[in-house]
Regions:
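Short, low-complexity N-terminal intrinsically disordered segments enriched in polar/charged residues
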Residues: 1-33, 37, 41-45
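Short, cysteine-centered beta-strand-loop-beta hairpins and adjacent loop/turn segments enriched
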Residues: 77, 105-116, 146-147
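A solvent-exposed, acidic/Ser-Thr-rich amphipathic alpha-helical stretch
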Residues: 39-107
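Short beta-strand edge/turn micro-motifs at domain boundaries
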Residues: 2-4, 97-99, 120-160
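Short, surface-exposed coil-to-beta transition loops
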Residues: 82-84, 118-123
Length: 187
């Protein structure tokens, strides 16, 4: 038993780094989940009160950005799905820098035609841990490329599957134990 305690004591810094990386990635994932579900309060919950988001044409304090982006997602697109790639994270005490690759797809109507919008970019984030929770202090978005094209016919009967909801009525909220405005999974 003492060997285990000794091992934990010797590796406490490494274990804390793993925990920090996990919690930071969880914040990044909570943000895109909230955007895809159009949950304004859950998007806002990933930002500190004094945060700022530079998202190209939409740049605002984090809590204002949450409202602006959710309104845009609801009015312009019928669906939105973010896919996250690798994250590079450097933690220094209660501050961290993170770079995360994203691929986003959206569907919208244009003159009666369903259009597929695609973007690939990176989130360049500064996060801070306050009261034990990692949130964005500064979020900057790069855009590597974007594309828009008519969506072809589906090879699968989408209607035969569990239907998504762009709200907390989505099945993910129940299975993850989330409530409206809550983007973080309870630990």
């Amino acid at each position: 038993m003492n060997d285990k305690l000794e091992w934990f004591a010797q590796n406490a810094d490494k274990l804390q780094t793993l925990i920090d990386h996990f919690q930071i990635r969880e914040t990044i994932e909570a943000y895109v989940h909230a955007c895809d579900r159009c949950d304004r309060d859950a998007v806002a919950a990933t930002y500190h009160e004094d945060s700022f988001d530079y998202h190209g044409e939409i740049s605002n304090p984090g809590h204002v950005y949450a409202s602006v982006v959710v309104d845009a997602l609801k009015t312009k697109w019928e669906s939105c799905t973010h896919h996250l790639g690798q994250s590079r994270i450097k933690v220094t005490g209660d501050s961290a820098g993170a770079e995360t690759v994203f691929y986003a797809t959206q569907l919208r109507k244009e003159d009666g035609v369903t259009m597929l919008d695609q973007q690939v970019g990176r989130y360049i984030d500064t996060l801070e841990r306050r009261d034990g929770i990692w949130r964005f202090r500064l979020r900057r978005c790069t855009m590597e490329w974007g594309n828009s094209a008519p969506l072809g016919d589906s090879f699968v009967d989408v209607g035969a599957y569990l239907q998504p909801h762009r709200s907390p009525a989505d099945a993910s909220y129940e299975i993850l134990g989330l409530s409206e405005g809550s983007s973080f999974i309870e630990r």
